[in-house]
């Protein structure tokens, strides 16, 4: 009654007066919470789906877009939805992110990283011949394969959007919620950080009462 206890995977225990959880619901639903969540909040944590994004990162050794005169980034209806050139703050244009979503990403994730890279390069070479010999693999990443995240971003299911959005960020006993999944605006990590500020202010208000 005077605080909360967290039991960690390594067996250690932590105690605090209040807890802020930014754990995605894709992972939170597998963590025991006592007393249990209730109503629409419990339903959101249990059933909210997450979509995946599998990434292959490439480096352009030469500016292939200057050879064929076409914008470097591309949309595709093939296995990779988006081939996106990263433009850094200093104007560097070497890095390319190759993104697969949904079923395409899950098929890709079953393969070793090197094989994912090979498939991405083969596909880009096929649809954009000017890239042959001008791209090299840097690495791969999949949000769904990260055990503490298990998905790129959350989705609302039909008929539950209003109920979930109203309930899922509400404090539960001494547990408060933050993170991109309880943001109110779709403006990236800035909005996710705002949820942390909101949770902190909720706790400060309780501490000062």
Set out the residue ranges of the language-model regions.
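Flavin (primarily FAD) binding-site architecture
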Residues: 18-40, 57
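Conserved flavin/dinucleotide-binding core of flavoenzymes
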Residues: 3-5, 22, 52, 68-209
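Central beta-strand plus flanking loop segment that forms part of the substrate or channel wall
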Residues: 40-68
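Core beta-strand elements of the Rossmann-like FAD/NAD(P) dinucleotide-binding domain
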Residues: 9-18
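Short glycine/proline- and charge-enriched loop/turn segments
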Residues: 35-42, 154-158
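Solvent-exposed residues in well-ordered beta-strands and their adjoining turns
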Residues: 9, 59-61, 101
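Glycine-centered loop/turn positions within well-structured domains
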Residues: 4, 12, 26
């Amino acid at each position: 009654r005077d605080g909360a206890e967290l039991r960690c995977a390594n067996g250690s225990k932590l105690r605090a007066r209040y807890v802020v959880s930014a754990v995605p619901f894709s992972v939170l639903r597998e963590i025991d919470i006592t007393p249990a969540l209730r109503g629409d909040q419990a339903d959101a944590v249990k059933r909210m789906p997450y979509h995946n994004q599998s990434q292959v990162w490439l480096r352009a050794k030469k500016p292939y877009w200057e050879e064929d005169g076409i914008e470097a980034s591309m949309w595709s209806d093939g296995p990779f939805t988006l081939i996106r050139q990263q433009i850094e703050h200093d104007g560097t244009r070497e890095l390319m992110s190759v993104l697969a979503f949904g079923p395409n990403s899950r098929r890709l994730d079953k393969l070793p990283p090197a094989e994912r890279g090979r498939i991405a390069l083969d596909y880009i070479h096929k649809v954009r011949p000017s890239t042959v010999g001008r791209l090299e693999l840097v690495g791969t990443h999949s949000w769904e394969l990260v055990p503490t995240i298990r998905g790129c971003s959350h989705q609302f299911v039909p008929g539950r959007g209003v109920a979930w959005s109203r309930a899922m960020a509400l404090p539960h006993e001494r547990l408060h919620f933050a993170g991109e999944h309880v943001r109110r605006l779709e403006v990236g990590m800035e909005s996710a950080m705002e949820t942390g500020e909101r949770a902190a202010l909720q706790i400060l208000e309780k501490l000062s009462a």
